[in-house]
Amino acid sequence: MLFSWPYPEAPIEGYWGKPTSLIDWCEENYVVSPYIAEWSNTITNSIFLMTAFYSTYSAWRNKLETRYILIGMGFSLVGIGSWLFHMTLQYRYQLLDELPMLYATIIPSWSIFAETQEILIKDEKKRKESSFRIQMVISFIMCGIVTILTWIYVVVQKPAIFQVLYGILTLLVVVLSGWLTYYHVHDSFAKKNLFITMVMGMIPFVIGFICWQLDIHLCSFWIYIRRTYLALPLGVLLELHAWWHLLTGTGVYIFVVYLQYLRILTHGNPNDFLFIWRWGFFPELVRKGLPIGTSYSLEYLGPIVNTQVDDETKKNN
C-alpha cells in the first residue's frame, strides 16, 4: 500500500527507557516515535484537554458555580497526566494518570450527593439553612473516600481494586442524578432534554468501556491484524484504548453539561439560562443575554433557530 510501512520486528528501546508502570497496554511501544511509548494512547488525550478547556471556559463565561470551573480544571489534569503516562510508561506518571481521575470525579460526586440530601428537605427555609452543613459533611466523607482509594492505589498497588471502586463511585453519580431528574424536574420539556443529554453522555462511556475490555482481552488478535493487514500508519487507528480516550473525553463533557443543567433546574434559577443544542445535536447551557454565535435548536435535532433573527429580537427587547 502506498504511504505505508511495516511494524518493526524487534522491541524498541525508547527515549524513556524500560517501562516501570504497573500497566502496559496493548499498543506496542515506540513503534511510531522513539519519544512516545504509546503513540495513539498518548495523542488521543488531546480530547480531554480540548473538552476540559471549553467546559472551564463555558462555566466561567456563564457565571456558573465555582464547582464547575474546578471540574473542568480537574479533567484537564486527567488529560495531562494520561498524556505523560502513555508517553513514558513510567510509574510516577501512571500516578498522574489514574489518581487525577479520582480527584476530578470527586467534585461532581460531592455536588450530586449534597444536592440529593438537600432536596430531600421539603421546607425551603430549612433547606437553605442546612445547605452549608450538608455540603461540609459530604466533603469530609469524600475526603475519606479519596484517602482510602489513594492508599489502595499507591500502597497496596492494586489498580484493579481501585478501578472497581472508582467505577462504583461513578455509577452512584449516574444513578442519583437520574433519580433527581426523574422525580424532581417537573418541566417535561426540560426533563426530555436532560434525559437525552444524560444518555448521550453515557453511551460513549459504555462503548469506550467495551473497547477498553476488548483491547485487554484480545490483545494478540489486534496486534496480528495491525501487523498483518494494516501496517503503519493505519494500524494506529485500531488501538482500542485510544478509542476509550476519545469516547470518554466526549462523554465527560456531555455529562458535565447535563449536571450543570440539572443543578440549575433543581437549585438555581432556570429563567436565567437557555439550554441549547448547537447545530441541533451538541448540548450546551448558555446564560441568557450572551451571544450564541452558531445555529442551534432548543431540542435534540429540533428546528434550527436563525441566530441573526434571534439576536435582532434580543436587541429590540
UniProtKB/Swiss-Prot annotation:
Residues 122-133, 263-317 are cytoplasmic. This is Alkaline ceramidase YDC1. Residues 1-35, 57-67, 89-98, 157-160, 182-195, 217-239 are lumenal. GO terms for molecular function: N-acylsphingosine amidohydrolase activity. Keywords: Disulfide bond, Endoplasmic reticulum, Hydrolase, Membrane, Transmembrane, Transmembrane helix. The keyword Cell wall biogenesis/degradation does not apply. Its EC number is 3.5.1.-. One of its GO terms (biological process) is ceramide biosynthetic process. It comes from Saccharomyces cerevisiae (strain ATCC 204508 / S288c) (Baker's yeast). It is found in: Endoplasmic reticulum membrane. The lineage of its organism: Eukaryota, Fungi, Dikarya, Ascomycota, Saccharomycotina. Residues 36-56, 68-88, 161-181, 196-216 dip into the membrane without crossing it. Acyl-CoA-independent ceramide synthase that catalyzes the conversion of dihydroceramide and also phytoceramide to dihydrosphingosine or phytosphingosine. Prefers dihydroceramide. Very low reverse hydrolysis activity, catalyzing synthesis of dihydroceramide from fatty acid and dihydrosphingosine. Is not responsible for the breakdown of unsaturated ceramide. May play a role in heat stress response. One of its GO terms (cellular component) is endoplasmic reticulum membrane. It is a multi-pass membrane protein. Belongs to the alkaline ceramidase family. The chain crosses the membrane at residues 99-121, 134-156, 240-262. The keyword Transmembrane helix applies. It catalyses: N-hexanoyl-sphinganine + H2O = hexanoate + sphinganine; sphinganine + hexadecanoate = N-hexadecanoylsphinganine + H2O; an N-acylsphinganine + H2O = sphinganine + a fatty acid. Disulfide bonds join 26-219.
